[in-house]
């Protein structure tokens, strides 16, 4: 389907006169080219026409955003009036709340439509400029990028609107009685299960996702008495590692006890409260859960603490004096601080990677049953080296001024997607809420089990120093957008086609080639970021690595397992078609030409020279039980053969009888030593997730042969005697 036709079918009817006149611009290029080539005057006229279209789109988007803010302010006034009437003689009735809810729902739809409006016009400008540069021979792309940056309708941030709408909608939905959190919700410590999964969200779907979630969960605001500002959502972490990248490898390979140490702060750089955190990975077979622990530390003491000059006793002296925490809690924090300090000093840890993102958290205050966080504008920055941090624990030449344009390309990776994390706490056998099911099974998200910002940062920023890459590494060059599976927000689209379902086609050219841009060009910024994040100039890999089915350590939903990882399987294996008994579904976007999908998935990936893709393998606890059962079966056989040998030896009166008894005893000893060696070898390889053969091709046959030999020898010796 041509983009012009697609634009007509997916635009909002109410906004149709404010869209880019794509057909007019396209015809203008064709008409002037047909008249004898493209002259300087033609270029000037076309740029002027393009400027008018940009002014039209930018003015409409700006005015519409102001209108939305005004409508929200009006709803806030109406809500304040309802609050005042709650305890009066004339309390609000159901109709008052229904009117407010209808208005808020309409505002949400408007915000959603505005986001889609910006997305579609952004794509239209890209398409027409690409067509211009291709057919005229004049390069307009870099020049017009500056004009777009001056009128950035496509960079509108809706976070403030989402927070305001969340607060209002939560009040109206609960009819003036906001639900208070229950810290014990979900069961006691003995009968509930925690489940966590991570997803990628394409930027085009972020606004729709936020609006859908806030209809069920309010945005968690830690300081409701303060007006929300963008810096309130900023979270910055400094990850530490040593020169051998041991902590990176440990976290990537999911080694038992693997640690990650980071220093984190919230908001601006002038925040004096730093949190030192340690994440420890635990394997399922240990019966323990992975844990994250942290303790606070003032910024002025961080350098001294990391050098060992500032002792743990000094760090917690004030906390002991204040008495706000129990002695047991303080001792636990001190023990953690000592362990972290010892690890940093003994293993030569230094700052390596900084992660920055803006987090929107959705949760009922104090209620841990459903917790959702969405991290946007994720940036991973090099923190190592004297030219950056020197002797300081963090570099000071940057703050939270995303997108950090002052940094060179080799120092930063701007992650192309938002990160959605869903945490559930439910009783055993209890299903998650239906709306959560709909969310994680929808086209808005792409499941990425065990995704790690630290691992991705090291693997991209230090690409030349690592040999193992995370399993999602090849996925970075594949468009994760999928056809719409649910209509979460009822917008004003003229047709029933959901704009996010066409995005994968819109942003892919007719030759099925992904869009990439260079330099400061505005065009398809997320594709530029994604492609540059690999730190590899060769788009074609050379050394083949086979990929097995991906699995995640903690499964959120059975259905999510089938649908959520669809494009991973399509990318890592062959394109799946007409599979009925598989866990995955095909999600190649198709419109009028189903035989020619506009998103192409590679049938096979090969890793770069000298690199290997590490695919996580889940080891079920029953694997160890099966290993133990096999070992016990061998021991049972050994006991039987040993008992026979000892019995024969007890009644042996002749030399042949003693030799016969000895043959059974030797068989028993051989079985004990062999089975013990095999058990230990298998246990070590399973714990290390080594890709070796675990079947015993020779052991059972050898046992049968020597058993037959022992019996035969005993018969022959007794017959001769």
Swiss-Prot record:
GO molecular function: ATP binding; metal ion binding; polyphosphate kinase activity
PROSITE patterns: SPX
Residues at the catalytic site: 453
Gene Ontology CC annotation, any one: endoplasmic reticulum
Gene3D superfamilies: VTC, catalytic tunnel domain (3.20.100.30)
Catalytic activity: [phosphate](n) + ATP = [phosphate](n+1) + ADP
Enzyme class (EC, first level): transferase
Transmembrane segments: 632-652, 658-678, 698-718
Membrane topology per record: Multi-pass membrane protein
Modified residues (Phosphoserine): 495, 501, 546
Biased composition (Polar residues): 490-513, 529-547
Cellular compartment(s): Vacuole membrane
Pfam name, any one: DUF202
Subunit structure: The VTC core complex is an integral membrane heterooligomer composed of at least the catalytic subunit vtc4 and the accessory subunits vtc1 and vtc2. vtc1 is a small membrane protein without hydrophilic domain. Vtc2 and vtc4 are related and have 2 hydrophilic domains that face the cytosol, an N-terminal SPX domain and the central core domain. The central core in vtc4 is the catalytic domain.
Family: Belongs to the VTC4 family.
Name of this chain's protein: Vacuolar transporter chaperone complex subunit 4
Gene name of this polypeptide: vtc4
